[in-house]
Regions:
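Solvent-exposed, well-ordered loop and adjacent helix/strand elements within mature globular domains
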Residues: 2-5, 9-119
Length: 119
């Protein structure tokens, strides 16, 4: 082990469906009004650094709340929310504006979990 260095373990989850969502009542909770009063599944305020993952990814044990994901072409994001239960193998990237959401569309990208190596 190298002293003073953090060793990371990078695990490929696979190629997943990547979409986007906004903090509006029809996509989250009735009390959500834009950026305010919208909490994620872990009780944090929504943020452009957060993503929602489909329940099947959480149930599989491959992904956990607060995990750091690297999404090809998107960057690093933190798992802080859950998508609708009907979705499978999906990550929703948070965006603020409707135009951003429309421009993002639906993508199929490689996703990795980045964790400190506990060895």
């Amino acid at each position: 082990m190298l002293e003073g260095f953090l060793v990371l373990k990078i695990i490929l989850i696979g190629t997943l469906t990547i979409t986007s969502y906004r903090a509006v009542p029809e996509q989250t909770k009735p009390e959500c009004t834009g950026r305010h009063r919208c909490e994620t599944s872990i009780g944090e305020n929504v943020s452009e650094l957060g993503v929602a993952v489909s329940p099947d990814l959480l149930a599989s044990g491959r992904v956990h709340y607060r995990d750091c994901l690297y999404i090809s072409g998107v960057g690093f994001r933190i798992v802080d929310d859950t998508t609708n239960s009907r979705l499978r193998n999906t990550v929703d990237v948070f965006v603020y504006e409707k135009a951003e959401e429309k421009a993002f569309g639906v993508r199929h990208l490689k996703v990795w979990v980045v964790q400190p190596d506990q060895k």
